[in-house]
Amino acid sequence: MTIMRKTHPLMKMVNHAFIDLPTPSNISGWWNFGSLLGLCLILQILTGLFLSMHYTPDTLTAFSSVAHICRDVNYGWLIRYMHANGASLFFICLYFHIGRGIYYGSYLYKETWNIGIILLFLVMATAFMGYVLPWGQMSFWGATVITNLLSAIPYIGSSLVEWIWGGFSVDKATLNRFFAFHFILPFIIAAMAMVHLLFLHETGSNNPLGIPSNSDKIPFHPYYSYKDLLGGAALLAFFFTIVLFFPDALGDPDNYTPANPLNTPPHIKPEWYFLFAYAILRSIPNKLGGVIALVLSILVLALFPLLHTSNQRGLMFRPISQTLFWILVSDLFILTWIGGQPVEPPFIIIGQVASILYFTIILILFPIAGLIENKLLKW
Protein backbone atom coordinates (compact mmCIF):
# COMPACT_ATOMS: atom_id res chain seq x y z
CA MET A 1 0.00 0.00 0.00
CA THR A 2 1.35 3.46 -0.88
CA ILE A 3 1.80 5.95 1.93
CA MET A 4 -1.03 8.49 2.05
CA ARG A 5 1.30 11.49 2.34
CA LYS A 6 2.76 10.56 -1.05
CA THR A 7 -0.57 10.23 -2.87
CA HIS A 8 -3.12 12.61 -1.27
CA PRO A 9 -3.20 15.86 -3.36
CA LEU A 10 -2.82 18.20 -0.36
CA MET A 11 -0.51 16.07 1.75
CA LYS A 12 1.68 15.44 -1.29
CA MET A 13 2.49 19.17 -1.46
CA VAL A 14 3.36 19.29 2.25
CA ASN A 15 5.38 16.09 1.86
CA HIS A 16 7.46 17.49 -1.00
CA ALA A 17 8.10 20.74 0.87
CA PHE A 18 8.68 19.64 4.48
CA ILE A 19 9.01 15.85 4.83
CA ASP A 20 10.68 14.01 1.93
CA LEU A 21 12.47 17.13 0.65
CA PRO A 22 16.07 16.17 -0.26
CA THR A 23 18.29 18.54 1.74
CA PRO A 24 22.09 18.97 1.82
CA SER A 25 23.57 17.07 4.75
CA ASN A 26 25.86 19.92 5.85
CA ILE A 27 23.65 23.03 6.12
CA SER A 28 24.38 24.91 9.35
CA GLY A 29 22.30 26.91 11.82
CA TRP A 30 22.36 29.84 9.37
CA TRP A 31 19.78 27.92 7.32
CA ASN A 32 17.35 27.99 10.27
CA PHE A 33 16.25 31.56 9.66
CA GLY A 34 13.83 30.75 6.83
CA SER A 35 11.64 28.67 9.13
CA LEU A 36 12.11 31.23 11.94
CA LEU A 37 10.79 33.93 9.61
CA GLY A 38 7.76 31.70 8.95
CA LEU A 39 7.28 31.40 12.72
CA CYS A 40 7.55 35.20 13.11
CA LEU A 41 4.97 35.74 10.37
CA ILE A 42 2.48 33.32 11.97
CA LEU A 43 3.08 35.00 15.35
CA GLN A 44 2.48 38.47 13.86
CA ILE A 45 -0.68 37.43 11.99
CA LEU A 46 -2.18 35.81 15.12
CA THR A 47 -1.33 38.61 17.56
CA GLY A 48 -2.36 41.21 14.96
CA LEU A 49 -5.71 39.50 14.44
CA PHE A 50 -6.51 39.67 18.16
CA LEU A 51 -5.34 43.29 18.37
CA SER A 52 -7.55 44.27 15.43
CA MET A 53 -10.60 43.01 17.36
CA HIS A 54 -10.13 45.82 19.91
CA TYR A 55 -8.40 48.53 17.87
CA THR A 56 -10.28 51.45 16.27
CA PRO A 57 -8.67 53.14 13.22
CA ASP A 58 -9.87 56.64 14.08
CA THR A 59 -7.72 59.67 14.94
CA LEU A 60 -9.80 60.46 18.03
CA THR A 61 -9.85 56.96 19.53
CA ALA A 62 -6.84 55.04 18.09
CA PHE A 63 -4.45 55.99 20.92
CA SER A 64 -7.11 55.32 23.58
CA SER A 65 -8.00 51.96 22.02
CA VAL A 66 -4.36 50.82 22.32
CA ALA A 67 -4.34 51.96 25.97
CA HIS A 68 -7.64 50.09 26.46
CA ILE A 69 -6.09 46.93 24.98
CA CYS A 70 -3.17 47.16 27.43
CA ARG A 71 -5.30 47.92 30.49
CA ASP A 72 -8.70 46.28 30.09
CA VAL A 73 -8.41 43.37 27.65
CA ASN A 74 -7.38 40.00 29.12
CA TYR A 75 -3.66 39.63 28.41
CA GLY A 76 -4.01 42.58 26.01
CA TRP A 77 -0.68 43.99 27.25
CA LEU A 78 0.99 40.68 26.33
CA ILE A 79 -0.57 40.54 22.85
CA ARG A 80 0.35 44.19 22.18
CA TYR A 81 3.98 43.78 23.30
CA MET A 82 4.30 40.47 21.45
CA HIS A 83 3.13 42.20 18.27
CA ALA A 84 5.35 45.27 18.73
CA ASN A 85 8.49 43.29 19.58
CA GLY A 86 7.57 40.57 17.08
CA ALA A 87 8.27 43.14 14.35
CA SER A 88 11.79 43.67 15.75
CA LEU A 89 12.31 39.91 15.93
CA PHE A 90 11.08 39.60 12.33
CA PHE A 91 13.70 42.10 11.14
CA ILE A 92 16.50 40.52 13.20
CA CYS A 93 15.78 37.18 11.49
CA LEU A 94 15.36 38.91 8.12
CA TYR A 95 18.76 40.63 8.31
CA PHE A 96 20.47 37.40 9.42
CA HIS A 97 18.74 35.57 6.55
CA ILE A 98 19.89 38.15 3.96
CA GLY A 99 23.41 38.21 5.47
CA ARG A 100 23.57 34.41 5.17
CA GLY A 101 22.44 34.69 1.52
CA ILE A 102 25.22 37.19 0.77
CA TYR A 103 27.93 35.28 2.67
CA TYR A 104 27.24 31.88 1.12
CA GLY A 105 26.35 33.11 -2.40
CA SER A 106 22.70 32.00 -2.21
CA TYR A 107 21.85 35.03 -4.36
CA LEU A 108 22.89 33.00 -7.42
CA TYR A 109 19.42 31.41 -7.24
CA LYS A 110 18.14 34.52 -8.99
CA GLU A 111 14.35 33.94 -8.83
CA THR A 112 14.44 33.01 -5.14
CA TRP A 113 16.68 36.01 -4.38
CA ASN A 114 14.55 38.53 -6.29
CA ILE A 115 11.33 37.31 -4.69
CA GLY A 116 13.16 37.68 -1.36
CA ILE A 117 13.87 41.34 -2.20
CA ILE A 118 10.18 41.90 -3.03
CA LEU A 119 9.33 40.24 0.31
CA LEU A 120 11.74 42.60 2.09
CA PHE A 121 10.01 45.64 0.55
CA LEU A 122 6.58 44.24 1.52
CA VAL A 123 7.67 43.57 5.12
CA MET A 124 9.17 47.08 5.39
CA ALA A 125 5.95 48.65 4.06
CA THR A 126 3.87 46.59 6.50
CA ALA A 127 6.07 47.50 9.47
CA PHE A 128 6.00 51.20 8.57
CA MET A 129 2.19 51.25 8.34
CA GLY A 130 1.87 49.28 11.56
CA TYR A 131 4.03 51.85 13.37
CA VAL A 132 1.54 54.58 12.39
CA LEU A 133 -1.48 52.80 13.90
CA PRO A 134 -1.01 53.51 17.67
CA TRP A 135 -1.26 57.22 16.71
CA GLY A 136 1.42 58.43 19.10
CA GLN A 137 3.72 61.37 18.35
CA MET A 138 6.32 59.28 16.51
CA SER A 139 3.55 57.45 14.60
CA PHE A 140 2.11 60.71 13.28
CA TRP A 141 5.38 62.48 12.52
CA GLY A 142 7.01 59.35 11.10
CA ALA A 143 4.05 58.97 8.73
CA THR A 144 4.24 62.66 7.78
CA VAL A 145 7.99 62.64 7.11
CA ILE A 146 8.18 59.33 5.22
CA THR A 147 5.09 59.87 3.02
CA ASN A 148 6.34 63.41 2.31
CA LEU A 149 9.44 61.91 0.68
CA LEU A 150 7.27 60.97 -2.30
CA SER A 151 6.79 64.69 -3.01
CA ALA A 152 10.39 64.62 -4.30
CA ILE A 153 9.20 62.68 -7.37
CA PRO A 154 9.20 65.21 -10.24
CA TYR A 155 5.88 66.50 -11.62
CA ILE A 156 3.49 64.06 -9.87
CA GLY A 157 5.09 64.19 -6.38
CA SER A 158 2.76 66.53 -4.46
CA SER A 159 -0.41 65.10 -6.08
CA LEU A 160 0.79 61.59 -5.19
CA VAL A 161 1.36 62.52 -1.54
CA GLU A 162 -2.11 64.09 -1.20
CA TRP A 163 -3.62 61.02 -2.89
CA ILE A 164 -1.89 58.72 -0.37
CA TRP A 165 -2.92 60.97 2.55
CA GLY A 166 -6.52 61.21 1.34
CA GLY A 167 -6.40 64.94 2.15
CA PHE A 168 -3.95 67.76 2.72
CA SER A 169 -2.26 66.22 5.75
CA VAL A 170 -1.91 62.90 7.58
CA ASP A 171 -5.37 62.48 9.10
CA LYS A 172 -8.28 60.08 9.63
CA ALA A 173 -8.35 58.92 5.98
CA THR A 174 -4.61 58.12 6.14
CA LEU A 175 -4.94 56.16 9.39
CA ASN A 176 -7.92 54.22 8.03
CA ARG A 177 -6.22 53.15 4.81
CA PHE A 178 -2.96 52.31 6.62
CA PHE A 179 -4.94 50.00 8.91
CA ALA A 180 -6.58 48.31 5.90
CA PHE A 181 -3.22 47.82 4.14
CA HIS A 182 -1.49 46.74 7.36
CA PHE A 183 -4.16 44.05 7.78
CA ILE A 184 -4.02 42.66 4.23
CA LEU A 185 -0.26 42.82 3.51
CA PRO A 186 0.83 39.97 5.87
CA PHE A 187 -1.39 37.57 3.91
CA ILE A 188 0.20 38.77 0.66
CA ILE A 189 3.60 38.24 2.35
CA ALA A 190 2.56 34.68 3.29
CA ALA A 191 1.57 33.98 -0.34
CA MET A 192 4.85 35.44 -1.62
CA ALA A 193 6.79 33.37 0.93
CA MET A 194 5.20 30.25 -0.57
CA VAL A 195 6.34 31.36 -4.06
CA HIS A 196 9.81 32.04 -2.55
CA LEU A 197 9.83 28.45 -1.24
CA LEU A 198 8.51 27.07 -4.54
CA PHE A 199 11.43 28.57 -6.47
CA LEU A 200 13.92 27.45 -3.80
CA HIS A 201 12.68 23.85 -4.09
CA GLU A 202 13.17 23.98 -7.87
CA THR A 203 16.93 24.21 -7.32
CA GLY A 204 17.33 22.80 -3.81
CA SER A 205 19.13 24.53 -0.96
CA ASN A 206 22.61 25.96 -1.19
CA ASN A 207 25.13 24.77 1.43
CA PRO A 208 28.09 26.28 3.34
CA LEU A 209 30.67 24.86 0.90
CA GLY A 210 28.82 26.32 -2.09
CA ILE A 211 29.30 23.09 -4.07
CA PRO A 212 26.65 20.80 -5.64
CA SER A 213 25.30 18.47 -2.97
CA ASN A 214 23.19 16.08 -5.09
CA SER A 215 25.43 13.17 -4.14
CA ASP A 216 24.80 13.69 -0.43
CA LYS A 217 21.19 14.60 0.36
CA ILE A 218 19.14 13.61 3.42
CA PRO A 219 15.36 13.89 4.02
CA PHE A 220 14.20 17.14 5.62
CA HIS A 221 12.19 15.22 8.24
CA PRO A 222 13.30 14.20 10.86
CA TYR A 223 16.74 15.83 10.59
CA TYR A 224 15.98 19.45 9.79
CA SER A 225 12.43 19.51 11.13
CA TYR A 226 13.86 18.88 14.62
CA LYS A 227 16.72 21.30 13.99
CA ASP A 228 14.11 23.95 13.10
CA LEU A 229 12.12 23.12 16.24
CA LEU A 230 15.23 23.72 18.34
CA GLY A 231 15.84 27.02 16.54
CA GLY A 232 12.20 27.99 17.10
CA ALA A 233 12.44 27.18 20.82
CA ALA A 234 15.61 29.31 21.16
CA LEU A 235 13.95 32.15 19.24
CA LEU A 236 10.83 32.06 21.43
CA ALA A 237 12.95 32.00 24.61
CA PHE A 238 14.82 35.12 23.42
CA PHE A 239 11.55 36.70 22.27
CA PHE A 240 9.68 36.23 25.56
CA THR A 241 12.69 37.47 27.51
CA ILE A 242 12.36 40.78 25.66
CA VAL A 243 8.53 40.87 25.77
CA LEU A 244 8.27 40.10 29.50
CA PHE A 245 11.34 41.89 30.88
CA PHE A 246 12.18 44.71 28.43
CA PRO A 247 8.99 45.35 26.43
CA ASP A 248 9.79 49.01 25.68
CA ALA A 249 13.55 48.67 25.11
CA LEU A 250 13.22 48.77 21.32
CA GLY A 251 10.42 51.36 21.11
CA ASP A 252 10.39 55.15 21.23
CA PRO A 253 9.14 56.88 24.42
CA ASP A 254 7.63 59.64 22.22
CA ASN A 255 5.00 57.15 21.07
CA TYR A 256 3.47 57.20 24.56
CA THR A 257 2.40 60.79 23.85
CA PRO A 258 -0.79 61.08 21.74
CA ALA A 259 -0.28 62.47 18.22
CA ASN A 260 -0.27 66.27 18.09
CA PRO A 261 0.06 67.96 14.67
CA LEU A 262 0.95 71.26 16.40
CA ASN A 263 3.96 69.92 18.30
CA THR A 264 6.93 68.41 16.44
CA PRO A 265 9.15 66.00 18.45
CA PRO A 266 12.81 67.16 18.69
CA HIS A 267 14.14 64.06 16.87
CA ILE A 268 11.89 62.31 14.37
CA LYS A 269 13.23 58.82 13.71
CA PRO A 270 11.80 55.48 12.59
CA GLU A 271 12.07 52.16 14.44
CA TRP A 272 15.61 50.80 14.90
CA TYR A 273 15.36 48.39 11.95
CA PHE A 274 14.97 51.27 9.45
CA LEU A 275 17.70 53.50 10.89
CA PHE A 276 20.45 52.36 8.48
CA ALA A 277 18.31 53.36 5.47
CA TYR A 278 17.23 56.58 7.23
CA ALA A 279 20.91 57.49 7.77
CA ILE A 280 21.60 56.97 4.04
CA LEU A 281 18.56 59.14 3.22
CA ARG A 282 19.76 61.96 5.49
CA SER A 283 23.37 61.85 4.32
CA ILE A 284 22.43 63.37 0.94
CA PRO A 285 21.55 67.10 1.15
CA ASN A 286 19.23 66.91 -1.89
CA LYS A 287 15.66 65.63 -1.30
CA LEU A 288 15.26 63.63 -4.53
CA GLY A 289 18.84 62.34 -4.26
CA GLY A 290 18.15 61.16 -0.72
CA VAL A 291 14.98 59.32 -1.76
CA ILE A 292 16.84 57.61 -4.65
CA ALA A 293 19.67 56.58 -2.27
CA LEU A 294 17.08 55.27 0.22
CA VAL A 295 15.45 53.02 -2.41
CA LEU A 296 18.83 51.96 -3.82
CA SER A 297 20.08 50.98 -0.35
CA ILE A 298 17.68 48.00 -0.57
CA LEU A 299 17.46 47.63 -4.36
CA VAL A 300 21.26 47.26 -4.56
CA LEU A 301 20.72 43.70 -3.28
CA ALA A 302 19.30 42.84 -6.72
CA LEU A 303 22.73 43.56 -8.25
CA PHE A 304 24.55 40.88 -6.22
CA PRO A 305 24.01 38.09 -8.81
CA LEU A 306 25.23 40.41 -11.60
CA LEU A 307 28.34 41.54 -9.69
CA HIS A 308 29.48 38.03 -8.74
CA THR A 309 32.96 37.66 -10.27
CA SER A 310 34.45 34.85 -8.18
CA ASN A 311 34.75 31.27 -9.41
CA GLN A 312 33.68 30.13 -5.95
CA ARG A 313 30.13 30.51 -4.76
CA GLY A 314 30.38 31.50 -1.10
CA LEU A 315 32.91 33.38 1.01
CA MET A 316 33.89 30.26 2.97
CA PHE A 317 37.39 30.08 1.39
CA ARG A 318 37.79 33.73 0.32
CA PRO A 319 39.53 35.75 3.07
CA ILE A 320 39.59 39.10 1.20
CA SER A 321 35.85 39.00 0.48
CA GLN A 322 35.22 37.79 4.05
CA THR A 323 37.02 40.84 5.41
CA LEU A 324 34.93 43.10 3.15
CA PHE A 325 31.73 41.34 4.26
CA TRP A 326 32.44 41.98 7.94
CA ILE A 327 33.42 45.60 7.22
CA LEU A 328 30.01 45.92 5.49
CA VAL A 329 28.27 44.49 8.57
CA SER A 330 30.17 46.95 10.82
CA ASP A 331 29.25 49.76 8.42
CA LEU A 332 25.56 48.85 8.76
CA PHE A 333 25.89 49.04 12.56
CA ILE A 334 27.46 52.50 12.21
CA LEU A 335 24.65 53.62 9.87
CA THR A 336 22.06 52.31 12.36
CA TRP A 337 23.71 54.31 15.15
CA ILE A 338 23.92 57.48 12.99
CA GLY A 339 20.25 57.16 11.96
CA GLY A 340 19.27 57.60 15.61
CA GLN A 341 21.48 60.67 16.18
CA PRO A 342 20.56 64.34 15.56
CA VAL A 343 21.67 65.97 12.28
CA GLU A 344 24.75 67.84 13.55
CA PRO A 345 28.55 67.46 13.40
CA PRO A 346 30.28 65.01 13.72
CA PHE A 347 27.33 62.71 12.91
CA ILE A 348 26.71 64.23 9.46
CA ILE A 349 30.16 63.42 8.09
CA ILE A 350 30.25 59.98 9.75
CA GLY A 351 26.90 59.17 8.10
CA GLN A 352 28.12 60.38 4.70
CA VAL A 353 31.34 58.36 4.87
CA ALA A 354 29.44 55.26 6.04
CA SER A 355 26.87 55.68 3.22
CA ILE A 356 29.59 55.98 0.56
CA LEU A 357 31.40 52.97 2.05
CA TYR A 358 28.17 50.90 1.96
CA PHE A 359 27.70 51.37 -1.79
CA THR A 360 31.44 51.19 -2.56
CA ILE A 361 31.86 47.79 -0.87
CA ILE A 362 28.86 46.27 -2.65
CA LEU A 363 29.27 47.81 -6.12
CA ILE A 364 33.05 48.07 -6.47
CA LEU A 365 35.10 46.25 -3.82
CA PHE A 366 33.23 42.90 -3.76
CA PRO A 367 33.61 42.33 -7.56
CA ILE A 368 37.29 43.41 -7.47
CA ALA A 369 38.00 41.12 -4.48
CA GLY A 370 36.42 38.21 -6.39
CA LEU A 371 38.72 38.80 -9.37
CA ILE A 372 41.81 39.13 -7.14
CA GLU A 373 40.96 35.85 -5.37
CA ASN A 374 40.55 34.08 -8.73
CA LYS A 375 43.99 35.37 -9.72
CA LEU A 376 45.59 34.28 -6.42
CA LEU A 377 44.15 30.77 -6.88
CA LYS A 378 45.32 30.78 -10.54
CA TRP A 379 41.74 30.06 -11.72
Swiss-Prot record:
Q: What is this protein called?
A: Cytochrome b
Task: Give the residues the record marks as binding heme b b562.
Answer: 83, 182
Tell me the membrane topology, using the record's own terms. Multi-pass membrane protein
A GO biological-process term: mitochondrial electron transport, ubiquinol to cytochrome c
UniProt xrefs under InterPro entries: Cyt_b/b6_C, Cyt_b/b6_C_sf, Cyt_b/b6_N, Cytb/b6-like_sf, Cytochrome_b, Cytochrome_b_C_euk/bac, Cytochrome_b_N_euk/bac, Di-haem_cyt_TM
The record's listing under Pfam families reads:
Cytochrom_B_C, Cytochrome_B
Per UniProt, heme b b566 binds at 97, 196
The main location is mitochondrion
Q: How does it assemble?
A: The cytochrome bc1 complex contains 11 subunits: 3 respiratory subunits (MT-CYB, CYC1 and UQCRFS1), 2 core proteins (UQCRC1 and UQCRC2) and 6 low-molecular weight proteins (UQCRH/QCR6, UQCRB/QCR7, UQCRQ/QCR8, UQCR10/QCR9, UQCR11/QCR10 and a cleavage product of UQCRFS1). This cytochrome bc1 complex then forms a dimer.
Q: What does this protein do?
A: Component of the ubiquinol-cytochrome c reductase complex (complex III or cytochrome b-c1 complex) that is part of the mitochondrial respiratory chain. The b-c1 complex mediates electron transfer from ubiquinol to cytochrome c. Contributes to the generation of a proton gradient across the mitochondrial membrane that is then used for ATP synthesis.
Say if the entry is tagged with keyword ATP-binding: no
Instruction: Drop me one GO molecular function for this one.
Output: ubiquinol-cytochrome-c reductase activity
Q: How is the cofactor bound?
A: Binds 2 heme b groups non-covalently.
Tell me what else is known: Heme 1 (or BL or b562) is low-potential and absorbs at about 562 nm, and heme 2 (or BH or b566) is high-potential and absorbs at about 566 nm.
Q: A GO CC term?
A: mitochondrial inner membrane
